[in-house]
Amino acid sequence: MEMTNAQRLILSNQYKMMTMLDPDNAERYRRLQTIVERGFGLQMRELDREFGELKEETCRTVIDIMEMYHALHVSWTNLKDAQTIDERRVTFLGFDVATESRYLSYVRFMVNTEGRYTHFDAGTHGFNSQTPMWEKYQRMLSVWHSCPRQYHLSSNEIQQIINA
């Protein structure tokens, strides 16, 4: 992240204020303040991640993935023979924190801040699937979108989606 000295000074002052306003996270803000003040290039890359951008199209895709899992779970609940499909297969896992952190951050924002999909179980890892999921979800979405009744899926349709 390239910043002028003036921008670094402004951000440093913001971190200093946050240290006073949020004592529980003061150590984190002091660390970031030091990084910005001294311009440590390697650590400045952390700010790129914090101030990253998620395009509107990507946000819509993440919401679509979450909506697909909502539809899968609702459909699974309505099945007469739901035992044939393990509930864990229709439960949203989230995204990999190591490789898909921007998507994971958006999911957490949608659930914890926006109050959407609050019925999803974050598990002990807070929607960290611990394995890359983006490509899998893309295949699943393709199958789900081809289903005529996306919220009234049959057992066979659910199987096709989760096995995509």
UniProtKB/Swiss-Prot annotation:
Pfam families: YfbU (PF03887). It comes from the Bacteria. SUPFAM superfamilies: YfbU-like. InterPro entries: UPF0304_YfbU (IPR005587), YfbU_alpha-helical_sf (IPR023146), YfbU_helix-hairpin_sf (IPR023145). Belongs to the UPF0304 family. HAMAP family: UPF0304. This is UPF0304 protein Ent638_2838. The lineage of its organism: Bacteria, Pseudomonadati, Pseudomonadota, Gammaproteobacteria, Enterobacterales.
